[in-house]
Amino acid sequence: MTERGAMVVSSSTCYVPFRCPQARKDFAFVEPSKKLNPNRVLIKPPVYTYSPALTAAKCNIFDYAETGENLVGDKQFVRWFREAWPYLWAHRSCTFVVTISGDVLDGPYCDLVLKDIAFLHHLGIKFVLVPGTQVQIDQLLAERGREPTYVGRYRVTDSASLQAAKEAAGAISVMIEAKLSPGPSIYNIRRHGDSSRLHETGVRVDTGNFFAAKRRGVVDGVDFGATGLVKKIDVDRIRERLDSGSVVLLRNLGHSSTGEVLNCNTYEVATACALAIGADKLICIMDGPVLDENGHLVRFLTLQEADTLVRKRAQQSEIAANYVKAVGDGGISSFPEPLGYNGMVTTPNNHIGRPIWEKLSPTFQNGVGFDNGNGLWSGEQGFAIGGEERISRLNGYLSELAAAAFVCRGGVKRVHLLDGTISGVLLLELFKRDGMGTMVASDVYEGNREAKVEDLAGIRQIIKPLEESGALVRRTDEELLRALDSFVVVEREGHIIACAALFPFFEEKCGEVAAIAVASDCRGQGQGDKLLDYIEKKASALGLEMLFLLTTRTADWFVRRGFQECPIEMIPEARRERINLSRRSKYYMKKLLPDRSGISVVRTFQYDS
């Protein structure tokens, strides 16, 4: 039995560490013969009943623990683990396609990235890895006195380049397999696990010909040689390997119907795979962060915002121009106005508010593009980025942002662009509330906007049944009109399907959440959670530190989302004076964490650090 700086209990004795102040005091009253050593006190079981001194020592044990040399780190670890559990639960059994740039694979952080992937795999996340090879191919060519040739986004693959591509892909595959093979620490398994598993390999890695390719051919007079395009992803085999517990390693070498080996673009392979298998996320691990014009990390972009940023640079960026060509010129008009970071959305009257991914993601017909070759991307299975523009970084990470917007429009709801030179960036992005990279999302704040006068009828229709049941306080049309500026609505197909209100109390730095309501036929789709998250981000952007609410029927729903019951005295006085005590409402409050990924109340398209 070991001592860990806290009480250790066995069937016969209870030891209290001598350094505990209460234990030191009690130690003076212990007979000399019973003083086992100067570091601990032996208290026999009879004393372990209701001795006031011992009870005090037991009550103070965690106070003592807080002062321990190593226990500050322990407390932080426990706090982090508790904060991470919702994400652990949410990510389990999800499928992530991860592309790792050649710069990261060639750098000092490669081992840590792969170690984190192995860890996440054992937590139940399914991975398809698509490693980049551009850096390694160029290095091999340089060693042989050859210069790489790029035209647009693609490499011109002559015989020397193809040989280098084969060598680079093979070496990287072997390296990744080796890095994922070690199991966990034998010491930890012996201490907490099954010793029969001491010599098992860590992660099973499956690689092979998981996609078919075709030659790019001659384009605008340029013969691209053995450069390939993705023709078809073998979805069934990939899913079979993932379901069997393997990590799938998808190299950028494709095979044609005539048996040729073709060098394909890594991002085209990754994006095509993510779309074909219906991945939950595409994660791009790069050699740097996505920054705005002020040098601040861009933490979050809606699909509409990412699309807008890429389109604005179509005149100066060939990759951005190819994105516009791939997705069409008219796509942007079908979006709502930018959410920006302010929540002050102004939506055109003719906006059809159904989910962006429903409207812009025709069914993926593997092998013939989208919509049987007649859809938005009939000529491409994925979106290629590369060439001199990407290597030079003249436009930063615009090329990766274009790829992110492309797959979001195709149906992948979340894309994460991560700086692979940050140790643990994958864990920080997936398990921290604010993340550590840039997330592009097609499903966040879908249709959310500030309420307008013409929304009154829709809001009334949603809240009326809840008012009649007593779940919400009745509001007259005049009261609803006066409070309209505080309401947020969700619009779909021209109809209001959900609403909520935030009433700020700036002096007390808190706000009231009220009138959260979802149309009966839209419940169970997460609309309430989206509204609450939107309200929380807006409150944080307004400088508020707490949210409170009054409820009679929905306490459980709010408790599960971090609210705790509080006394009426914690409600701002100005609000307490207007409370109808006859409703016997319960009062709940939630402390807001600083949210750097939230919205800004400034009515401009900008990003806050």
Swiss-Prot record:
<feature type="transit peptide" description="Chloroplast">
    <location>
        <begin position="1"/>
        <end position="67"/>
    </location>
</feature>
<keyword id="KW-0012">Acyltransferase</keyword>
<dbReference type="Pfam" id="PF00583">
    <property type="entry name" value="Acetyltransf_1"/>
</dbReference>
<comment type="function">
    <text>N-acetylglutamate synthase involved in arginine biosynthesis.</text>
</comment>
<keyword id="KW-0055">Arginine biosynthesis</keyword>
<comment type="pathway">
    <text>Amino-acid biosynthesis; L-arginine biosynthesis; N(2)-acetyl-L-ornithine from L-glutamate: step 1/4.</text>
</comment>
<dbReference type="InterPro" id="IPR033719">
    <property type="entry name" value="NAGS_kin"/>
</dbReference>
<comment type="similarity">
    <text>Belongs to the acetyltransferase family. ArgA subfamily.</text>
</comment>
<dbReference type="GO" id="GO:0009507">
    <property type="term" value="C:chloroplast"/>
</dbReference>
<keyword id="KW-0028">Amino-acid biosynthesis</keyword>
<keyword id="KW-0934">Plastid</keyword>
<keyword id="KW-0808">Transferase</keyword>
<dbReference type="InterPro" id="IPR000182">
    <property type="entry name" value="GNAT_dom"/>
</dbReference>
<keyword id="KW-0150">Chloroplast</keyword>
<feature type="domain" description="N-acetyltransferase">
    <location>
        <begin position="446"/>
        <end position="594"/>
    </location>
</feature>
<dbReference type="Pfam" id="PF00696">
    <property type="entry name" value="AA_kinase"/>
</dbReference>
<dbReference type="InterPro" id="IPR016181">
    <property type="entry name" value="Acyl_CoA_acyltransferase"/>
</dbReference>
<protein>
    <recommendedName>
        <fullName>Probable amino-acid acetyltransferase NAGS1, chloroplastic</fullName>
        <ecNumber>2.3.1.1</ecNumber>
    </recommendedName>
</protein>
<dbReference type="GO" id="GO:0006526">
    <property type="term" value="P:L-arginine biosynthetic process"/>
</dbReference>
<keyword id="KW-0809">Transit peptide</keyword>
<dbReference type="InterPro" id="IPR010167">
    <property type="entry name" value="NH2A_AcTrfase"/>
</dbReference>
<dbReference type="GO" id="GO:0004042">
    <property type="term" value="F:L-glutamate N-acetyltransferase activity"/>
</dbReference>
<dbReference type="InterPro" id="IPR036393">
    <property type="entry name" value="AceGlu_kinase-like_sf"/>
</dbReference>
<dbReference type="InterPro" id="IPR001048">
    <property type="entry name" value="Asp/Glu/Uridylate_kinase"/>
</dbReference>
